Amino acid sequence: MPFNPLERAFSWKHLTATNQISSKSGMLHTITINRGDPAAASIVTVYDGIGVTADIIAIIILDTALYTVPTTLVFDCGYLTGLYITFSAVTLADITVSYK
C-alpha cells in the first residue's frame, strides 16, 4: 500500500497561556518551545486531565539560557482523561503542542 501521510498526522495548538488541549484520552506527541522570555523564565506544566488537580505529565522551564529555540521535546506518551497545560506567568514565551 502507498504511504498516506495523513494516517500519522497530529493535531496541534500554539499556546501563549493556560489552555485545555483535549478533554478525552489521546497521545501527547511533542511540545516545541518556540520562544522563551529572556527577562523571566516561565514554567509550563502539562497535566493528564482537565485541570490543575490532575496527574502531572511534565514540568518544563522555559528559559532562553537553557534552550536554543526552537527546541522540540518528544513525549510520545498517552494521557487518559485529557490534556491541560498551564503557564506559571504571563510572559513572551510560547509553545506548540502536537497530539492525537
Locations of the language-model features?
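Surface-exposed, low-hydrophobicity beta-strand/loop segments enriched in small/polar/acidic residues
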Residues: 1-100
